[in-house]
Amino acid sequence: MIDPKLKRALGQAAKGVEIVAATHDGVTRGYTSHWVSQVAFEEPIVMASVSPKHDTYPLMIASGAFTVSFLAGDQIDIGQYFSYPAHRFHYIAPEYLTEVNGHPVVPDSLSWIHCEIFETKELGDHVLLFARVTDFGYGRLKESPLIYSSRHGWRVANDKARTPGESPRDALLARVAAAGFDTSAAGSDEED
C-alpha cells in the first residue's frame, strides 16, 4: 500500500486526460487515463500503463491494439464518465465513443491515435504497453486540453480549480440514477 503522503506528492503533477479504449469481438471498453506517454519520435511509439484488473486490459491484449483520445477542456464529463469508481456505468452512454476507421474514438476530442502493441512489461501493479502509432486524427487542436492533478482536480489550463460540489461527474451520476440504476457504490467526487 502506498504511503498517503507519497501519493499526495506524486499527485501534484498536472497531466493531460485521455480516454484509452479497445475493441475485440464486437465488445468495446474504455477508461480515463493520465498515464499515456510518447516515448519515441522518429518512429512514433507510445507507452500506456494499465492495471491488468481493468476490464479494458483483456481487450487490449486480445486485439493487440488500443486507441487514445486526448480530451479538450470542455470534455470533463467524458473524462469523469470513464473514470473510477463509476466504472460499471461506462457502457450506457454510447454517445461518448464512436467508431472512426474501425477504432473507438471520443467524438470532438482534440486528437486521437490508434496504436498497435509490440511489447508489454509487467511493472508493480500495472502493465506497460509499448505500441506503434498506426493511425490518427484530430479535430479541435486550438482548444485547451483537459488536465488533472489530485490537488486541483479537473481543469483547463489557466482556469481556476473546480468548486467542490459542482462536479460534472456527480451530475452524470444523477442522470444514471434517474435512469433507474443504483449509484450508491459509485462514491463521491470529494473522496480521496
Named regions from a protein language model:
Residues 1-192:
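Basic, polyanion-binding surface patches
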